[in-house]
Amino acid sequence: NTSASVDHDCLIEDFAHISPNCSLSGSVRVGKFSHLGTGTSVHPGIHIGNNVKTAVGSKVFKNILDDTVQKN
């Protein structure tokens, strides 16, 4: 996607959506059907579960469980 950055050893599962200007550091996993809002930054080694939604500009420092909506 436009200006998205996906670093080494990341796993993006089926039907996950990475919006423009997202940044995934190394060894990040994004689960099925998850949606990372525009400008989301994910720190190294984070696991984002299935069917997760993050708000625009989110900073993800901790793992996110399945079926979660993360607001800023």
PLM region descriptions:
Residues 5:
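Short alpha-helical catalytic segment bearing the HExxH-like zincin motif
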Residues 2, 11-15, 19-72:
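Glycine-rich hexapeptide-repeat left-handed beta-helix
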